[in-house]
């Protein structure tokens, strides 16, 4: 898992008015919470947030905070980014403090490898779950979970229970959940062949 640094500033004032002023000044308001600590209000540069979540790990990147007084050298992951509905610019960020020796729960993207045999025969790929909910130590968070679909035939699916996860990583989704499958040929294609 990628680990990066992010400069922040703590702030004592909170509320909608303060948040609007921060955004007008080109900063993002946020909060750091978790691990039995009182929530701490922060602000940061949008560029710093974008750099911290860049790369394949995205929101699961481990971020070491810099310049935040008591929060200096604290390791966090992004819990949530609230975005403007139209511009998609960050409006607020929630950061969750982690302990490197305690397990965390995160969503990790699924990456499909190969082309399903059933798709080559005219079937339709049904990629039902693009991410999986896992539990592991922060240092073991994978960037993605790879699933080889080359042998997947029409009418078959790969379920959570059939996926092999890296050592120390446990999927907490229902084992019977289908992640990816191949559906039969489209009706008009089947009718044309008949």
From Swiss-Prot:
One annotated Gene Ontology cellular component of this protein: cytosolic large ribosomal subunit
Signal sequence, renumbered to the chain: none
Coiled coil: none
Keywords: Ribonucleoprotein, Ribosomal protein, RNA-binding, rRNA-binding
Pfam families xref list: Ribosomal_L25p, Ribosomal_TL5_C
Molecular function in Gene Ontology: 5S rRNA binding; structural constituent of ribosome
InterPro entries given in the database record: Rbsml_bL25/Gln-tRNA_synth_N, Ribosomal_bL25/Gln-tRNA_synth, Ribosomal_bL25_b-dom, Ribosomal_bL25_C, Ribosomal_bL25_long, Ribosomal_L25_dom, Ribosomal_uL5_bac-type
Source superkingdom: Bacteria
GO biological process: translation
Family: Belongs to the bacterial ribosomal protein bL25 family. CTC subfamily.
Quaternary assembly: Part of the 50S ribosomal subunit; part of the 5S rRNA/L5/L18/L25 subcomplex. Contacts the 5S rRNA. Binds to the 5S rRNA independently of L5 and L18.
Functional summary from the UniProt entry: This is one of the proteins that binds to the 5S RNA in the ribosome where it forms part of the central protuberance.
Name assigned to this protein: Large ribosomal subunit protein bL25
